[in-house]
Amino acid sequence: MKTKIILILFLSIGLIGHGQVMTLEECIRQGIANNLTLENSRIDINKSRTGISQNRARLLPVINGVFQFTDYLKRPVNVTTGTLLGNDFPEDPTWQTIRSMQYNVNAGVQLNMPLYNQVIYASIDAAKTVEQLSHLSYEKAVEDLTMQIGKVYYLAQSSLEQTMLTDENISRMQELCAITEAMYEQGVVLEVDLNRARINLQNLKAQQDQFAMLYAQQLNMLRFLLDLAPEEQLEVERMPRDIVQINISGISHTLPELRMATKQKELIDRKITAIKAEYIPTISLTGYAGALGYQDKINHFFHTKASSQNWFGNCFIGLNITIPIFDAGSKKLQIRQHKYDAEQAINRAELLQDKIMTDYSNALLQLDHNIEVFQTQTQSYQQACDVFKVTQEQYREGVSSMTAILQDEMQLRTAQSARTQAHYLFNLAQLELLRLSGNLLSLTEK
């Protein structure tokens, strides 16, 4: 089973090795174009624009068709004095009753249009702020995706470098095993020395399998971020032999998260303004045009001469004025809640600013430290190579022991690994500095 897994991993690496080699810049561009998380952020922008249109539509007139049919199961009665009914009634009645017809039909067109409503205008301003926030959220999502792609890309480069260095170490150890086996056959070394060399070779092969698996996993993660099919072949560039420094400016004060913090405070202020606008009276235009029909039998609406005689026009236009008087302190409490939110937003903005400054300082320290480590380990690696060559030659001549040559080989591998790790951490620190200086997208402009 283990042999099958190792074979599958090597076949995967073999396919990847013949796949498309993509630079970091190409990966970032493709990720921005394809990533589904960014697509959702673009949809959020469209939703916020729709919110502005929705609030503006509240300023337009609303026209509704109205139709109502009423069947009075018990017909209503109106009571009045007879003198109000004209000469057809007795001159001195006490009361007269008028019974309504059983069926009533009301049909017409109703109009409502706001003329003065500060709540609507305040809501439009708030919707515009939400749209600006959605744009900033998209910028932040692009930044986050770029950081994710950069970290995975650099990690894949590190694993690829470790895999290739392990190949070199295996070749070196195979040569040492061949030398030791020849010396064993000649009786120069003991069998335990040969076994030590073989054990180290097996350990290196196991290490190679591990790096191959990590590299394959990191490429899969990169495919996910770029929205590529799992079967699509992909490979990253090999890590440069030397570190490449980029000029870094200071902290940018226009970072998306800083502008988002400011806009969130502004949105809270807009909400407070909208609530305060509810204290202001509103004026709206209202109108109606239609007709009322009455019949004592329902079929008279359609089949008798009376169907056209018992219809009465109804048309009016007017103004509605709404004056807020008492709301049990509801709006006051809402404003108080939003003021607390505003205080929290100010505190979050200050904390964010402090965190950015701390992250920038730490990234600078990390950058300088890893430059020093890389340079030191590069020298150590070169020295370890020279020492190993001398020890290997001495071992062939029977002057040096197997323990000494294995120790030198171990020091060489340690320097290799530390050098690669320092290069990887340098790339991460530089990536973070590019983000904090607002130059992250310069990676796509190379």
Stretches found by the model and what they are:
Residues 4-14:
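Sec-dependent N-terminal signal peptides
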Residues 19-68, 74-75, 230, 235-271, ...:
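Bacterial Sec-pathway N-terminal export signals of envelope proteins
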Residues 40-55, 141, 147-164, 182, ...:
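Amphipathic alpha-helical coiled-coil segments
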Residues 50, 142-254, 366, 370:
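Periplasmic alpha-helical coiled-coil/stalk elements that build and connect Gram-negative outer-membrane
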Residues 62-73, 81-140, 262-271, 278-351:
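Small/polar-residue-enriched beta-strand and adjacent coil segments characteristic
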Residues 64, 73, 418-446:
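Acidic, low-complexity, intrinsically disordered peripheral segments
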Residues 70, 74-77, 81-83, 196, ...:
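Outer-membrane beta-barrel domain signature
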Residues 128, 191-200, 336, 402-410:
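Short, charged, amphipathic alpha-helical segments
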